[in-house]
C-alpha cells in the first residue's frame, strides 16, 4: 500500500485509544451489576465471582499470543476479529439465561479483548516517530484511564434504570463504532520474520492455570480436598505446572525463556506486578455485593463509589508525568502503602457505614494503582532490550491478570467462609431462652415470643456475619499490600 493511502496517524491514534477505552470500560462496568446478576441468575457468592475471574483468566492466557496472532493475521485483521468477537460476546452475555452461560461468554469476551491493548499500543508506536512516543503514549493512556471512571458510573445508571443486561448491551454500539474505525484506519505493516510459538509450553501452562482457577473457584462449594473434583483440579494444576517447568528447562526455545529470570530487576518486577494484580480488582469485586447486601445502596450509587477508584487512578497517572524525577522504589513503596491504608480503612467499617466512608478509601486505592503501574514497569524492564523485551512484556501482563483472578477467588472464599463461621457462632444466641435478649435495652420493641421478631433478629445476625466476612477480606487485602514491601529493598536502580 502506498504512503498516500495510509490514514493520518491522528486517526490511528484515535482508533487505538477508543479500542483501549472499550476494553478498560468492560473490566469495571460489569462489577456494578454483580448483585443484580446474583439475584437474577440465582447464583451464590462464589459463583458470582466467576463472572469476573473467567474473564481475567481468559485474558491472562490469550495475552502472550498477541505477537504470534498479529504476525499470522496482520494487525488490521486481528484488531477487526477481536473487536467483532468482543461485541458478539458482549451481546451474548446480555442474553445469558444461566450463570454458566454468562461465565462462558465472559471468558470469550476476555479472550477476545486480551490482544486489544498490547496490539493497539504497538500500532500507535509504529505510526509515530520515536521522538513523539512520549506524548503519543500519554494520549493513548487516556483510554485506559478514562474507561474505569466511565464504566462503573454508566453501568450503574443503566443497571438501575433497566437491568443488568443493559450493562452488556451498552458495550455493543461502542464496539461497532470501534469495529468500523479499525477497518478504515488500521493498516498492516510488514514484519521482519515470522514469530514462532512454543505451543507445547503454552498448552501446559494453560492447563495449570485452568486447574488452579477451577480449584479455587469450586473449592469452598465442593468441600475442598474432601471432594474428588477438587483433588482432580489440583492434580491438573500441579501436573501442568511440573510439565511446564520441565519443558521450559529442556526446550531449545521455550514459551518462557528461563534466562529472563536471571535478570534481578525483571524477576522482582514479576513478583511486584503479580501482587499489583492481586490488589488491582479485588475491591471492585468485593464491594458491590457488600454495598447492596449490607447497606442496600442502588446500582447508581455503587457505580459512583467504584468510579471514585477510577478518579484516583487518573490522579496517580497524572502525577507519573514526573516519574523520571523520582526513584521508582520510593513510588512503589508509597503506592503499596496507599493500598494498605485503603484496605485498613475499609476493614474498620460497621454495618451503618455511609457512602463517604467507602468513597474515599476507593479513591485512595485508585491513587495507589496509578502510582504503582509506571514505576513497577520501569523497574521490570530497566535491563531488557530487543527480543527479550517483547518476551518479557507478554509474561509481565500475563502474571498481572493471573494475580487478579487468583486473589479475587481467594477473597471470595474468605468472605464466604468467615460469614458461615461467624453466623454459626452468633446464631445459637438468638433464642427466646437467652436471658440477655430479654433485657429491655437489648430487646427494644421486639417480642421474643413472636416468630416474626425472632426472624428479624436472625436476619440481622446474618447481616452482621456477612459484614464480618467482608471486613476480614479487607484485612487480608491490607496485609497483602504490606507483605511485599521488603522486596522493594532488593531492587537495583541507578539514574
Place the predicted regions along the sequence by residue.
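12-transmembrane solute porter fold
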Residues: 9-25, 30-32, 39-60, 67, ...
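Flexible interhelical linker loops that connect adjacent transmembrane helices
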Residues: 2-6, 131, 179-206, 221-225, ...
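C-terminal membrane-cytosol helix-exit motif in multi-pass small-molecule transporters
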Residues: 172-191, 208-218, 236-250, 487-492
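Alpha-helical transmembrane segments
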Residues: 14, 84, 205-209
Amino acid at each position: 500500500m502506498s504512503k498516500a493511502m495510509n490514514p493520518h496517524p491522528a486517526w490511528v491514534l484515535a482508533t487505538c485509544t477508543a479500542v483501549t477505552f472499550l476494553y478498560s470500560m468492560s473490566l469495571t462496568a460489569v462489577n456494578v451489576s454483580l448483585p443484580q446478576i446474583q439475584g437474577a441468575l440465582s447464583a451464590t457468592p462464589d459463583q458470582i465471582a466467576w463472572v469476573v475471574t473467567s474473564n481475567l483468566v481468559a485474558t491472562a492466557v490469550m495475552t502472550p499470543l498477541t505477537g504470534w496472532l498479529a504476525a499470522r493475521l496482520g494487525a488490521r485483521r486481528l484488531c477487526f476479529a477481536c473487536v467483532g468477537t468482543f461485541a458478539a460476546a458482549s451481546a451474548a452475555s446480555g442474553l445469558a439465561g444461566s450463570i454458566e452461560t454468562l461465565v462462558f461468554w465472559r471468558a470469550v469476551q476476555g479472550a477476545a479483548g486480551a490482544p486489544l491493548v498490547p496490539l493497539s499500543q504497538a500500532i500507535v508506536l509504529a505510526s509515530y516517530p520515536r521522538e513523539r512516543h512520549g506524548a503519543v503514549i500519554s494520549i493513548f493512556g487516556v483510554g485506559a484511564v478514562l474507561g474505569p471512571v466511565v464504566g462503573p458510573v454508566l453501568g450503574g445508571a443503566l443497571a438501575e434504570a433497566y437491568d443488568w443486561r443493559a450493562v452488556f448491551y451498552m458495550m455493543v454500539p461502542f464496539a461497532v463504532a470501534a469495529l468500523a474505525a479499525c477497518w478504515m484506519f488500521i493498516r498492516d505493516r510488514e514484519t521482519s520474520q515470522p514469530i514462532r510459538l512454543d505451543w507445547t509450553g503454552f498448552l501446559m501452562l494453560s492447563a495449570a492455570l485452568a486447574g488452579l482457577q477451577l480449584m479455587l473457584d469450586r473449592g469452598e462449594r465442593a468441600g475442598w480436598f474432601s471432594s474428588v473434583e477438587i483433588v482432580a483440579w489440583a492434580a491438573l494444576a500441579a501436573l501442568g505446572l511440573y510439565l511446564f517447568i520441565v519443558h521450559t528447562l529442556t526446550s531449545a526455545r521455550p514459551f518462557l525463556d528461563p534466562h529472563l529470570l536471571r535478570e534481578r530487576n525483571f524477576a522482582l518486577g514479576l513478583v511486584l506486578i503479580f501482587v499489583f494484580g492481586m490488589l488491582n480488582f479485588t475491591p471492585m469485586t468485593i464491594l458491590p455485593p457488600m454495598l447492596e447486601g449490607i447497606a442496600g445502596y442502588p446500582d447508581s450509587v455503587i457505580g459512583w463509589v467504584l468510579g471514585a477508584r477510577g478518579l484516583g487512578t487518573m490522579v496517580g497517572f497524572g502525577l507519573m508525568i514526573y516519574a523520571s524525577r523520582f526513584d521508582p522504589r520510593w513510588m512503589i513503596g508509597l503506592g503499596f502503602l496507599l493500598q494498605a491504608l485503603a484496605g485498613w480503612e475499609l476493614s474498620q467499617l460497621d454495618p451503618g457505614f455511609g457512602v463517604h466512608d467507602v468513597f474515599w478509601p476507593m479513591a485512595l486505592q485508585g491513587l495507589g494503582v496509578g502510582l504503582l503501574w509506571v514505576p513497577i514497569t520501569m523497574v521490570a524492564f530497566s535491563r531488557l532490550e530487543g527480543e527479550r523485551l517483547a518476551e518479557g512484556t507478554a509474561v509481565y501482563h500475563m502474571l498481572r491478570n493471573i494475580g487478579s483472578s487468583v486473589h479475587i477467588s481467594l477473597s471470595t472464599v474468605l468472605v464466604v467462609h468467615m460469614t458461615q463461621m461467624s453466623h454459626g457462632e452468633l446464631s445459637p444466641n438468638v433464642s427466646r431462652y437467652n436471658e440477655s435478649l430479654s433485657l429491655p435495652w437489648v430487646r427494644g420493641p421486639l417480642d421474643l415470643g413472636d416468630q416474626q421478631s425472632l426472624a428479624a433478629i436472625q436476619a440481622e445476625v446474618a447481616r452482621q456475619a456477612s459484614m464480618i466476612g467482608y471486613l476480614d477480606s479487607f484485612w487480608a487485602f491490607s496485609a497483602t499490600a504490606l507483605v511485599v514491601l521488603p522486596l522493594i529493598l532488593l531492587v537495583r536502580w541507578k539514574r
